[in-house]
């Protein structure tokens, strides 16, 4: 049975939590990051080989020349409250959400 939450007005809804971001579909626009105040995701680099690398790390310094685009990465899934705001603003539909059971 999925988790049920309530609005302030008492209406029931089922939170859908961010489970995954498809780095191949993500365009790195940052819209999801802007609407989420919970530190659920952050901007990373994607290399030619498909490796997702966090900025400011030793790994980033090693592969910086190989980064082909910047993408959002799920870095704080435990902070997601299941509101779905990120999905509503995503133009590339690169996120997977699911209810908890």
Swiss-Prot record:
[4Fe-4S] cluster 1 binds at residues 26, 29, 32, 36. Its cofactor is [4Fe-4S] cluster. It comes from Rhodobacter capsulatus. [4Fe-4S] cluster 2 binds at residues 80, 83, 86, 90. Disulfide bonds: none annotated. Ferredoxins are iron-sulfur proteins that transfer electrons in a wide variety of metabolic reactions. The keyword Transmembrane does not apply. It comes from the Bacteria. Residues 17-46, 70-100 form the 4Fe-4S ferredoxin-type domain. Binds 2 [4Fe-4S] clusters. Pfam families: Fer4_10. This is Ferredoxin-3. GO terms for biological process: nitrogen fixation. Keywords: 4Fe-4S, Electron transport, Iron, Iron-sulfur, Metal-binding, Nitrogen fixation, Repeat, Transport. GO terms for molecular function: 4 iron, 4 sulfur cluster binding; metal ion binding. InterPro entries: 4Fe4S_Fe-S-bd, 4Fe4S_Fe_S_CS, FdIII_4_nif, Fe-S_Ferredoxin. Homodimer.
